[in-house]
Amino acid sequence: MKGRALLLALLLLAGCGREQAPRFMPEGDAYPETLSQWGMLHLRDGHLTPAAEVLPYDLNTPLFTDYAHKLRTVWMPAGQAAQYGEDHFDYPVGTVLTKTFYYPKDAHGRLLKNTLDERDPAKGLALDQVRLVETRILLRQKDGWVALPYVWDEAQREATLEWAGASLDLTLQDDAGQPLAVDYQVPDANQCAGCHEERHGEGVRPLGPKVRHLNRELVYADGNANQLERWQAQGFLAGVPGPVADLPRNALFGHPRPDEPLERQARSYLDANCGHCHNPKGPARTSGLFLDAAAAMGINYGLCKQPVAAGKGSGDRLVDIHPGQPDASVLTYRVESTDPSVMMPELGRSTTHREGLDILQRWIASLPGNCQG
């Protein structure tokens, strides 16, 4: 009896230390109440670490979210792969995408506004160096994608499903020691779905993990690799039509490559931050302003185009993009504004992205021509 009791105790101890395997949930709506139940991210040795079967990824030019940093991951069921598509990948049922929003912090716990990458390629995020805010999950089920927002507790031990979202008043400190107030909003499930419905009536889709955003190198635990090549090696991507050098690629924000001039940087920024709504089938299609990667330069891209909004919404400026005159362009007015009734994007930020705005202003200033005649 004593031997059996000892064996049972050992088994129980082993079970306590066992990490949750990635959850396959092809259907149903009994979604886990806690993030740990998904098995995608583990708290291990003082770090938030992706599970062994889970791949981290990053984007060339990401969506701005009040200077939050983001740890992105992807997992697919064994033996399943996404099918390549230039505009969208066709992800298999059961795919789970996670995006953890966090801020770096100093030894005194002050949140920092910087662009440094805190991710350890082997271990993930050191919990004593970051403030975890939320983790958003996109789950591919048989009847489509589902968006699930999880909010981290102050102890950074667990994140809980919050259908209604959450609000946090944060203060960031820049390199000069100046404070920046952030009214951080965790979106509710409907807001998540609203932004991710890139084409009206076609349901939720991932916005970030597309070929033009993923086509870049990332530092993995075993060294640098192109993400598209790593996805193929992992068995997560099939049907790629050729070498990655021949595939679409957006500019690398903050560190543009030699072949990425100012116009490409600006267009990549607009694609990532505006194009999911401002495209011919998107929620903002009635504006006639199309800022996605496929849009041709011209009046529908905003050049000398009169805005649909007037008065306060346009800042009394006459055209969306006025060549040579960023201060006469509605586009820069709305990107700079933090007024909820004016600003674009209208969700996901309470501050102005100064670095992104600077790219747009310099690009518009460089454009030849005028809007006369």
Which residues does each PLM region occupy?
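Bacterial N-terminal signal peptides
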Residues: 5-14
